From Swiss-Prot:
GO terms for cellular component: cytosol; mitochondrial matrix. It is found in: Cytoplasm, Cytosol; Mitochondrion matrix. InterPro entries: Globin, Globin-like_OT, Globin-like_sf, Globin/Proto. It comes from Oryctolagus cuniculus (Rabbit). The keyword Protein biosynthesis does not apply. Keywords: Cytoplasm, Disulfide bond, Heme, Iron, Metal-binding, Mitochondrion, Oxidoreductase. This is Neuroglobin. Heme b binds at H64, H96. PANTHER family: BLR2807 PROTEIN, NEUROGLOBIN.
Length: 151
């Protein structure tokens, strides 16, 4: 990824990172809209959520949202050298596989991430910014896939 794309990612993330829980909730609400079959994968203390709203308001799930936003923050921070996160991201891949997430669902997560960024940034979410984020997300998923494949 070239320096201009890295800067677009950093600039846009500054706006998002001011309210990570709020924007992360938008991401997951969109994810559940697009792929409702993911909802049953989120259980805390053997509690099954009856609706996306029920899930999105639970303290345990809000903690999950915070963690996801921290992973995105780490990717942004290390955008010039994502290889420094390879092992960590492969481990996340293994964890997601272990709880029953299908690898194909990460495409929907990517769509949800772009949706959240567009809602947060409005007109500042340009085609160039979208392309930069798509490239970053693709690299993150590629690293996570190594955990899926057991490499």
């Amino acid at each position: 990824m070239e320096r201009p794309e890295q800067e677009l990612i950093r600039q846009s993330w500054r706006a998002v990172s001011r309210s990570p829980l709020e924007h992360g909730t938008v991401l997951f609400a969109r994810l559940f809209d697009l792929e409702p079959d993911l909802l049953p994968l989120f259980q805390y203390n053997c509690r099954q959520f009856s609706s996306p709203e029920d899930c999105l308001s639970s303290p345990e799930f809000l903690d999950h949202i915070r963690k996801v936003m921290l992973v995105i923050d780490a990717a942004v921070t290390n955008v010039e050298d994502l290889s420094s996160l390879e092992e960590y991201l492969a481990g996340l891949g293994r964890k997601h596989r272990a709880v029953g997430v299908r690898f194909s669902s990460f495409s929907t997560v990517g769509e949800s991430l772009l949706y959240m960024l567009e809602k947060c940034l409005g007109p500042a979410f340009t085609p160039a910014t979208r392309a930069a984020w798509s490239q970053l997300y693709g690299a993150v998923v590629q690293a996570m896939s190594r955990g899926w494949d057991g490499e």
